[in-house]
């Protein structure tokens, strides 16, 4: 049973949260939420020395994108993705991410990584290279899926980059918390129920992360998504929205109208899986018109609402164990939710790895607040308000005295945000026993809510005006600066050896997949889709 009201002695949602926080503050219990597992997945466009999208293949010296666990590609062959192993601290996570960037820059042959979420100068849509994963069946599936995304939404939209934060509380939390809550479900069902509650609450509060960390208020005029004509000219080469926090998270970016009718309920794991399963098995007439195989070429994996579950955009995803051999839907059914993936973070342009410690600390504390707060089901009316809030904050989050829709009324953004941050502060104090900066991260959030000029989005616009640069010139300068920074660092001997070995091993594994006996692709695909 999902937790929807107080079950811990409090007589209100706020009372229940306070009761759980007091329990965590008891001697020895704070360790239950410290040192959970976390990881980062960071995308960056690969560009040439002049800032144009690279048309070179993914560098072989980085390994095989299909099989490398840490260095792969996202949508485009020119969109590398840096994936850290799970770590027990944010410092370890960012150090690993930095090491991956050092290793990559040593092998990029003079190319750069674009530092912003909004793209560099792109070629015609059909010339943006789709990621290539070889001729094995798993590789073909990944490439054809991306080809389908291009037909459905356009390739340029898939060139928008971001940071994903993966998080799971310590394993030791679940049995103790289940006992404290006097819950009778199995351990697996309890964990899944609580993490689905976290997902619902994060959906409710995702706007706050967009406000605090959105860093894409402007874009290069060469990038013309639907709706760009509503933006204002900042300079001859730059479009912007004066109060925007994240055009990436707006209806100009990922949250476009193509999935506007699709709602995947997170009110329980069963509802989530059933809704996703329906979307990946229900034909969409618009996509039927594209065709699946046309003149012998695969255009998409199928003509369903979603080709596979990864196509569904959401601010946060419940995720199964990575060790499962099933596709995500099957794994969620069999093993439940193990961790969550936060997907609302823009690239922080001025940080060489795209994200910093303070951001990770705040998001971690926010996730704990979402986990331990009561989490009633989200009904259709509330979902409409959530969607409206998210878009409003993305497009106008820094507008003075902005009010957000909630409970069929409206609340001032700053006031509401400060109330949430006050609740998050209790969890930051729990996490900050060793002076790791969680409390300081919460204080930075307070300052940004009191003064919108202290947000990253405001800083980007301020830099553009102060330096009198177009967005393209500004981002290209940062890309060059970041390259010099990484080339000035040295990997430890062990890490250099490990990453070099992984590159070689991934190439061998990918080549072995291509040599191994395999069924025809159509048969392979039928087997893959049977695992729903």
Q: Can you describe what each PLM-predicted range is?
A:
Residues 43, 157-170, 339-346:
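Histidine-centered divalent-metal-coordination microenvironment in nucleic-acid enzymes
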Residues 123, 406-468:
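Long, compositionally biased intrinsically disordered regions
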Residues 134-155, 159, 167-331, 352, ...:
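Loop-rich catalytic cores of soluble enzymes, especially ATP-dependent carboxylate-amine ligases
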């Amino acid at each position: 049973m999902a937790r929807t009201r107080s079950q811990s002695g409090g007589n209100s949602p706020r009372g229940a949260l306070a009761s759980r926080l007091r329990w965590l503050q008891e001697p020895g219990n704070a360790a239950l939420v410290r040192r959970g597992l976390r990881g980062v997945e960071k995308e960056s466009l690969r560009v040439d020395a002049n800032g144009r999208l690279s048309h070179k293949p993914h560098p072989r010296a980085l390994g095989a994108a299909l099989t490398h666990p840490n260095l792969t590609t996202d949508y485009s062959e020119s969109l590398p993705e840096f994936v850290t192993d799970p770590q027990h601290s944010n410092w370890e996570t960012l150090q690993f991410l930095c090491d991956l960037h050092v290793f990559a820059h040593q092998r990029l042959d003079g190319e750069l990584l674009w530092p912003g979420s909004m793209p560099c100068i792109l070629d015609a849509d059909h010339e943006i290279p789709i990621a290539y994963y070889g001729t094995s069946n798993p590789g073909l599936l990944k490439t054809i899926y991306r080809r389908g995304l291009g037909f459905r939404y356009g390739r340029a939209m898939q060139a928008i980059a971001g940071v994903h934060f993966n998080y799971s509380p310590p394993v030791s939390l679940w049995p103790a918390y289940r006992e404290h809550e006097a819950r009778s479900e199995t351990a697996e069902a309890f964990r899944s129920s609580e993490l689905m509650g976290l997902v619902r609450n994060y959906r409710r509060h995702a706007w706050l992360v967009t406000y605090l960390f959105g860093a894409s208020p402007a874009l290069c005029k060469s990038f013309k998504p639907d709706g760009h004509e509503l933006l204002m000219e900042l300079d001859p080469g730059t479009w912007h929205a004066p109060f925007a926090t994240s055009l990436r998270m707006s209806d100009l970016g990922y949250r476009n109208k193509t999935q506007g009718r699709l709602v995947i309920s997170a009110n329980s794991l069963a509802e989530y899986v059933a809704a996703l399963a329906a979307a990946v098995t229900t034909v969409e007439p618009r996509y039927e018109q594209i065709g699946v195989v046309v003149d012998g070429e695969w255009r998409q994996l199928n003509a369903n609402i979603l080709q596979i579950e990864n196509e569904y955009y959401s601010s946060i995803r419940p995720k199964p164990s990575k060790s499962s051999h099933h596709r995500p839907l099957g794994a969620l059914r069999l093993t439940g939710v193990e961790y969550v993936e936060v997907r609302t973070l823009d690239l922080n342009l001025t940080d060489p790895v795209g994200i910093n410690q303070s951001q990770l600390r705040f998001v971690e504390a926010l996730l704990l607040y979402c986990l331990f707060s009561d989490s009633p089901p989200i009904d259709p009316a509330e979902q409409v308000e959530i969607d409206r809030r998210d878009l409003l904050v993305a497009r106008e989050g820094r507008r003075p005295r902005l009010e957000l829709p909630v409970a069929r009324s409206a609340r001032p953004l700053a006031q509401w945000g400060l109330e949430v941050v006050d609740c998050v502060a209790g969890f930051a104090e729990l996490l900050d026993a060793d002076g790791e900066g969680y409390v300081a991260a919460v204080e930075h959030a307070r300052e940004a809510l009191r003064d919108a000029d202290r947000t990253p989005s405001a800083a980007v616009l301020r830099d553009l005006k102060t330096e009198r640069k177009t967005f393209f010139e500004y981002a290209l300068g940062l890309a060059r600066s970041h390259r010099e920074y990484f080339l000035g660092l040295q990997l430890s001997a062990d890490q250099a050896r490990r990453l070099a070995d992984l590159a070689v091993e991934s190439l061998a594994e990918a080549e072995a997949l291509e040599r191994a006996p395999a069924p025809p692709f159509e048969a392979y695909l039928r087997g893959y889709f049977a695992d729903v």
